[in-house]
Amino acid sequence: MSRVCKVTGKKPMAGNNVSHAHNKTRRRFLPNLQYHRFWVESENRWVRMRVSTKGIRTIDKKGIDVVLADLRAAGEKI
């Protein structure tokens, strides 16, 4: 399963661990993804999505109906 936020599109990114002696080793920065259930009043059902915490804040701000409409317009099956 991919580590991608359904709402924001956040993905893992690469970087370095840097020690006190400035030795660098490669690492991945993973997005803070959560499985979250949202109640969709217009459809009278729960929708379970894998979203980042920023995606949850976006849904709180815009509303789940607007976000779902944007995802469906982009061809996402929900």
Swiss-Prot record:
Keywords associated with the record: Ribonucleoprotein, Ribosomal protein
GO cellular component, one term: cytosolic large ribosomal subunit
GO biological process: translation
Listed GO MF terms: structural constituent of ribosome
Coiled coil: none
Gene3D superfamilies with a match to the protein in the record: Ribosomal protein L28/L24
Identification of the protein by name: Large ribosomal subunit protein bL28
Record organism: Acidithiobacillus ferrooxidans (strain ATCC 23270 / DSM 14882 / CIP 104768 / NCIMB 8455) (Ferrobacillus ferrooxidans (strain ATCC 23270))
